[in-house]
C-alpha cells in the first residue's frame, strides 16, 4: 500500500512539472513586454529568471535558512512578499498568494517582482551579481 501511495504522489508531481510552463529568454522578454515592462529592463529580468528558476514558472525553492521559501519564475520570498498556503505569517508586501506566483500566467509574478524591485532594487535577487555587467541581449527577441 505504501508503494501505491508513493507511486500516486510521484505521478502527480511529475504531471505538475510536465504541465508547468518553461519560458525561453525571448518568450519571457516578449511576455513581459506585453505586460508593460519597459524594454530597457527586459535583459535584467530575463537574466534574473534564468538564474533563479531556469525560466520555469512552477519552481518552489528549498527552505531558506529562516524557513521561508521562494516561489515562481522570479523566486519571490514568502516571508516578505507573498502569502504562503501553509498559513505561516508573512508581510505579504505584494498582496498575493504564493501559489499564484506558480501559474503559467506570469502577470502576478511580474507585478510582484516589479514591486520588490521598487522597494529593494535589483540586488533583492542574490543572482543579480551574476547578471550585473553581463546581461544577455534581447535584441533578437523582437
From Swiss-Prot:
Keywords: Antimicrobial, Bacteriolytic enzyme, Disulfide bond, Glycosidase, Hydrolase, Secreted, Signal. One of its GO terms (biological process) is killing of cells of another organism. Residues 1-20 form the signal peptide. It is found in: Secreted. Belongs to the glycosyl hydrolase 22 family. One of its GO terms (cellular component) is extracellular region. It holds the Pfam family Lys. Its EC number is 3.2.1.17. It is an enzyme of class 3 (hydrolase). Disulfide bonds join 26-141, 47-131, 82-98, 94-112. Its main location: secreted. Residues 21-142 form the C-type lysozyme domain. This is Lysozyme 1B. Expressed only in the midgut where it localizes to a few cells in the posterior region in all larval stages. It catalyses: Hydrolysis of (1->4)-beta-linkages between N-acetylmuramic acid and N-acetyl-D-glucosamine residues in a peptidoglycan and between N-acetyl-D-glucosamine residues in chitodextrins.
Amino acid at each position: 500500500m505504501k508503494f501505491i501511495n508513493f507511486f500516486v504522489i510521484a505521478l502527480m508531481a511529475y504531471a505538475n512539472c510536465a504541465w508547468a510552463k518553461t519560458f525561453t529568454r525571448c518568450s519571457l522578454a516578449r511576455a513581459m513586454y506585453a505586460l508593460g515592462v519597459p524594454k530597457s529592463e527586459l535583459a535584467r529580468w530575463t537574466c534574473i529568471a534564468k538564474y533563479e528558476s531556469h525560466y520555469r514558472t512552477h519552481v518552489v525553492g528549498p527552505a531558506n535558512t529562516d524557513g521561508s521559501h521562494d516561489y515562481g519564475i522570479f523566486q519571490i520570498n514568502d516571508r516578505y512578499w507573498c502569502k504562503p498556503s501553509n498559513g505561516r505569517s508573512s508581510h505579504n508586501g505584494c498582496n498575493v498568494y504564493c501559489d499564484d506566483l506558480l501559474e503559467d500566467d506570469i502577470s502576478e509574478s511580474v507585478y510582484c517582482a516589479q514591486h520588490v524591485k521598487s522597494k529593494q532594487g535589483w540586488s533583492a535577487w542574490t543572482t543579480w551579481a551574476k547578471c550585473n555587467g553581463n546581461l544577455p541581449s534581447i535584441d533578437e527577441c523582437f
